[in-house]
């Protein structure tokens, strides 16, 4: 993805060169690398419109995919701004920790500012969900109530539980689907259903997988 920003690609053929297939049919990625750490500096030094580099690039391949997910590090920088400009919906994972709530507030403030400053009505904050959750602990229950009080109806009911299999597959560079039964997979599937962003056919297919 660093090449996308560095060379400010605008053509579909240029973007397609960055796309890699995965072991999962129908799932492609544009991976990052250590070089991506220089992207913020390179964008800052450029005098062009740095806010829409990602949006302009993804527009060329938008019709090739049902969904495009943008995964951002928790930072308020030009990369996050690019993702906000390029998005229709924004979903934020949070942990039941005080600094996570502070970071979420900063993210929401950025979204509101960008929407108002640039008149971007299409962007919607869909909600936040709790990740790495130990659902039987008092810390989780207290933290969930704290987020509920601050987010009202913007906190999804489905938490994603802690799952040691995530670390295991990360070490072997495998998909989580290769690990067999996984709490995280089940939770993310239920979370997708709660978000109501799937097509009717996709929703029925996912429900069928959960019932197996």
Question: Can you describe what each PLM-predicted range is?
Answer:
Residues 1-212:
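P-loop NTP-binding core
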């Amino acid at each position: 993805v660093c090449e996308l920003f560095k060379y400010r690609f605008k053509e579909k053929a240029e973007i397609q060169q960055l796309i890699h297939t995965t072991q999962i049919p129908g799932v492609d990625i544009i991976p990052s690398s250590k070089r991506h750490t220089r992207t913020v500096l390179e964008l800052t030094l450029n005098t062009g419109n740095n806010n829409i580099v990602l949006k302009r690039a993804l527009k060329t391949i938008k019709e090739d995919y049902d969904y495009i997910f943008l995964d951002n590090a928790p930072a308020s920088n030009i990369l996050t701004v690019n993702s906000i400009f390029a998005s229709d919906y924004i979903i934020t994972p949070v942990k039941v920790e005080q600094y996570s709530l502070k970071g979420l507030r900063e993210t929401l403030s950025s979204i509101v500012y960008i929407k108002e400053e640039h008149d971007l009505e299409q962007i919607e904050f869909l909600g936040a969900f709790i990740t790495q959750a130990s659902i039987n602990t008092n810390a989780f229950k207290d933290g969930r109530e704290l987020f509920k009080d601050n987010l009202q109806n913007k906190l999804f009911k489905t938490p994603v539980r802690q799952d040691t299999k995530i670390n295991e597959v990360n070490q072997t560079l495998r998909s989580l689907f290769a690990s067999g039964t996984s709490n995280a997979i089940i939770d993310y599937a239920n979370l997708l259903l709660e978000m109501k962003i799937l097509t009717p056919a996709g929703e029925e297919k996912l429900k069928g997988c959960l019932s197996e």
